[in-house]
From Swiss-Prot:
This is Phosphoribosyl-AMP cyclohydrolase. The keyword Magnesium applies. The keyword Acyltransferase does not apply. Binds 1 Mg(2+) ion per subunit. Binds 1 zinc ion per subunit. Gene3D superfamilies: Phosphoribosyl-AMP cyclohydrolase. NCBIfam families: PRK00051.1 (NF000768). It comes from Bordetella pertussis (strain Tohama I / ATCC BAA-589 / NCTC 13251). Keywords: Amino-acid biosynthesis, Cytoplasm, Histidine biosynthesis, Hydrolase, Magnesium, Metal-binding, Zinc. Pfam families: PRA-CH (PF01502).
């Protein structure tokens, strides 16, 4: 007997059973991070209202904030037009989404002309990662 929710049938997972997931601040619209979700992670996220991802490096579910305390409360889940990307509109607890201690994982901007361009860090560290992951 299949206990998977019917809405899951519209979600297109890749050959590894994963789908990219974009976490966006529900209030400001700032993109916080991109991660991956498995069916189990997406189902748990929808059921609990807390963001759960699939850690490709650890090969297990990653409940955002389980180590750092910086959980994501999900306000809304959206599916893109092709069904192959999830958007999570979240409240980021602690204001830190990135393991580097920044609000967003997108803290570097490309500056300069094509051949002279370089990535410049534009967002500050809000909390030392060594204090987050101790």
């Amino acid at each position: 007997m299949n206990t998977e929710p019917t809405w899951m049938a519209e979600v297109v997972f890749d050959e590894n059973g994963l789908i990219p997931a974009i976490a966006q601040d529900a209030e400001t619209g700032q993109i916080l991070m991109v991660a991956w979700m498995s069916r189990e992670a997406l189902a748990e996220t929808a059921a609990t209202g807390r963001a759960v991802y699939w850690s490709r490096s650890r090969q297990r579910l990653w409940r955002k904030g389980e180590e750092s305390g910086h959980a994501q409360d999900v306000h809304e889940l959206r599916l893109d037009c092709d069904g192959d990307v999830i958007l999570l509109k979240v409240h980021q607890n602690g204001g830190i989404a990135c393991h580097t201690g920044r609000a967003s994982c997108f803290y570097r901007r490309l500056e300069g002309t094509a051949s002279q361009a370089e990535w410049i860090t534009i967002d500050p560290v809000l909390k030392d990662p060594e204090l987050i992951y101790k």
